[in-house]
Amino acid sequence: MKAYIIHENEVWTKPLESHLNKLEVGYEDWHVEKAKIDLSQSPPEGIFYNRMSASSHVRGHRFAPEYTSVIINWLKSHKRRVINDGNALALEISKSLQYLKLNESGIKTPRSIFCSSKEQLIQSARDFKKPFITKHNRAGRGLGVKLFNNQNELEHYVKGPNFENSIDGITILQEYIEADPKVIH
C-alpha cells in the first residue's frame, strides 16, 4: 500500500522518506502548496500521514493548516486512513486545546489566560502573579515566548513597535514556572 505524506516542510519529511525507502514502501510527497484537491474526484487508495505544523507561517505557508484541513476532510469523506487526522491538526494549532486536553488527562498546566487584544493582555496581567510570560496560541519553535517581571515591562512591549501578535490573534498570558536545574529536558 502506498503512503502519502501531507506536509509543508521538506526538512521534517526527509527522515521519514529515508526510512520508507529502506523499507521499500512506496510513497508520494503531498506538499500542501502543490496538492490540488478536486472534491468531485476520489482520492487515491493508501495511507495518508499528516505532518502539518503550527509554525508553517514562518516558512511562508500561512494557510497550510487550513488547506490541510480541506485535504483531511476530503480523505475522511472517502474513508481513507489518515494518521494524525483532523483531531491531531486541531491540537497542533491550538495551545488552548492542548492545555484543556492535558488538564482533562490529569496533567496540570500553568495558569493561562487567552487574550484576543492588546487591551485584554494588559488588563489580565494586572492581577497576575509576577513574573509571567506571553506566548502565541498558534505557534511552534518558541514563537512569541517572552518573560516579564512586572506590569510595566509588559505594557512597554505590548504598546511598542516590537509587539509580535500570534498568527491567530490569540496571545497567552501564562504563569512563569522556573525550570528546575536538576531536571534535564
Segments (PLM) and residue ranges:
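Short loop/edge segments at beta-strand edges and connector loops
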Residues: 31, 84, 114-116, 149, ...
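Conserved N-proximal alpha/beta basic substrate-recognition cap immediately N-terminal to
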Residues: 8-111
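Phosphate-binding site of ATP-dependent enzymes
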Residues: 143-185
